[in-house]
Amino acid sequence: MKITDLKPTIVWKFFHQVTQVPRPSKKEGKMIEFLESFAKEYKIAIKKDEAGNLLMSKPATPGMEDRPVVVLQSHMDMVCEKNNGTKHDFDNDPIETIVDGEWLRANGTTLGADNGIGVAAELALLASDDIQHGPIECLFTVDEETGLTGAKALKEGFMTGDILLNLDSEDEGEIFMGCAGGKDTQATFHYEPVPTSDKMQYFRIDVKGLNGGHSGGEIHKGLGNANKILVRFLFLLKKKYDFVLCSIDGGNLRNAIAREAHAVIGLHPENKEDVRILLNHFAADVENELKHVDPSVQLAMESTDRPEYHIDNATAEKLIYALHACPHGVIGMSHDIEGLVETSTNLASIKMKEGNTILIGTSQRSSIDSCKIAIANTVASTFLLAGADVKHGDGYPGWAPNPDSKILKIAQETYKRLFNKDAKIMAIHAGLECGLFLEKYPKLDMISFGPTLRDVHSPNERIEIATVGLWWSHLLELLKSIPAK
């Protein structure tokens, strides 16, 4: 079975088209062209702002003209992650999709259902002539995944809707009424390159096989973080043996839990077998710790060519200690909503850069703004104590739940009517663009909902096929049921 054989046909048709268009964050040009061509083909009114956000407008169907304007919103960019050994150019290659039982996934890469399925649903709605709805506006934002820059750049008056349906949630049957705010903290270490010695032997230490995942929606699962595992081993090594750190690299994206990390070290030949034994014992500990969530974790040590330089020992020691001390994971749970993560932090990436610098990327989230700032300052303090330069990003606001939301009530009623069961009303620890929309449009009545996705922001990303039809049915029933102004 192929993606084009799936039901509802019109949604999967457009999702397939979306997967054929490269759309990395900050490189959405081809996607913008695709959407503009769609609007031209279907004679849909369209406008674009300076950031590249697109808004398509469609009049009400006959008899629905007195309904309020509804904005449907999704982001057009996708997280670009692939497995080691997977050959894929995200700037140019289409995503290869595979129907795998009850799920649709990609072939060794992220699928881009986050948030391509939302884009597809909007296009299906715009292209259809047999769906009842009031006046609608479909908003497609850019660069949600790496900075929310599209939502931040949105100007007052660009859209006119009174109600906004965000299509960027990942559990069918759950309706979201709030989300966390976020802030990034970056640390930069400066080091002196020291010529390596031919009296040492050099080895690459790898951490791989982890699932990774979304650092908001999946932080509560206790998934392994490759950066933390690698640094934990280097810390143990530092306590027992003399070695030099030549290079270190781990993770990629601020909003993804690191799946892979590696370091190149130099050892005295007489210590190499003892270090292998130490690594094997450590690997056994990690495998035991993660057996329920990351059973495929692997740690490996292989000989490698002698690098030209290593990081000066004083900086390497401070780097290892600071990374080991840097908090990662859930910091606190909500006292207002049972089961909701309130505050968390993600040690996202470790990258060696030009100018003899090492850049550490971290991301903090909280549904309470003061807690978000507090954990960002905790992370900053860890690196400041080690002599690093630290800076914070601007961050983005959370979306405070509104229990009196009219659209929430309609969404609950329509779900119950369709499926004879109650939808779960939730807040999400992940960041959504909704908080930024409220800054510019404070009277917006909003909810977020979507089909079931798993392992987003990783090559294991997949979408549960049957839930797309359920979500689509709910969306259509909801649009039909919104009362006159």
Model-identified regions with their sequence ranges:
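His/Asp/Glu-rich mid-to-C-terminal helical/loop segments that flank catalytic regions of hydrolases
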Residues: 157, 223-240, 268-272, 318-324, ...
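Midchain, well-structured core segments that form catalytic/ion-binding scaffolds
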Residues: 102-105, 145, 152, 156-365
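Acidic/His- and Gly-rich active-site-bordering loop/insert found
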Residues: 2-103
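Acidic, glycine-rich active-site loops and adjacent beta-strand->loop/helix elements
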Residues: 76-78, 139-147, 169-172, 211, ...
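Active-site-adjacent substrate-binding region
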Residues: 225, 232-248, 393-395, 401-444
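Glycine/charged-rich beta-loop-alpha catalytic/anionic-binding loops adjacent to active sites
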Residues: 95-109, 211-213, 416-421, 452-456
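Zn-dependent metallopeptidase/amidohydrolase metal-coordination segment
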Residues: 3, 8-11, 335, 342-358, ...
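Active-site metal-coordination/substrate-binding segment of hydrolases
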Residues: 64-146, 151-162, 199-202, 313-317, ...
